[in-house]
């Protein structure tokens, strides 16, 4: 640390500027939320591809429900404590989110999951803000909290979709 850093003088200002410049070189080392939360499975055969993912940015994270990426965070019920995060309500299995208050008939995909012994929970999220964030009425999330599929209606062939996302094809 420069000795003059605390001085109220031009030497002190120069010392502070020198330290600022040195600290700024570490920005990407510490400000890497884009790397941490923006990791994706693009091109994976166990993801039902849908659209182009957000551009890679090592510093900034852009929440997106495009399959292959980590599911976006959403605060439930206006809370900030345990149980108020959507992540807190996810199980250790595949989870089908029904978003925005539309109770789509998910019986066919639930039946296909039972037939394949794929653990699946259906979670109703009536918040329209969540629907806006996820951009679809239905989102299928893997146990590792990555989006596997999304749509505005149940998949036309749920057995085929499940076979794909569990690697059975």
Residue ranges and their predicted role:
Residues 1-169:
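Helical substrate-recognition/capping region of FAD-dependent monooxygenase/halogenase enzymes
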